[in-house]
Amino acid sequence: SDGSCFPGQLNFRKAFQNTLESLQEIYAALPDNWKVFVEYKAFEPNFYSMTVGDWGQSLLYANKLGPEAYTLVDLGHHLPNANIEQIVSLLLMEGKLAGFHFNDSKYGDDDLTVGSVKPYQLFLIFNELVEGMDARGMNHAKDLGWMIDASHNVKDPLEDLLQSVE
């Protein structure tokens, strides 16, 4: 379920249960070395409610699914002024951080070049990542999913990729 546009359009509990049941079927069918990443988004395509609207709901799904289910953080999927570095810290602490869709945003899920609008926030996120991964003895290159999620409609994708990894 992608949520709802207005009150009364969706039964929140049924939407959660239906999504959980679907995820449980997928999780049960996974090959042994696969993981499930549950991504959340505060809005879009709907604005009244989302079935996986924040990191807490994603973590709830991941915990209900099992040890190979994790929360994926997309930097553009938060409400304005969300403390993403705190979210990263807590998910790392719980061993439930899957990885990232790296991008940036000014107005919503803009999928802009990572660090182009909020470079200091990106620094704070990486500060938590290094400290938290070191505390857990994690491999910086392999233990999380590192993905760039930028819009090819905004600028040349190769240019964006090069600027993102600089």
Model-derived regions: residue spans:
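A cross-domain feature marking catalytic cores of carbohydrate-active enzymes
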Residues: 1, 38-42, 71-77, 101-104, ...
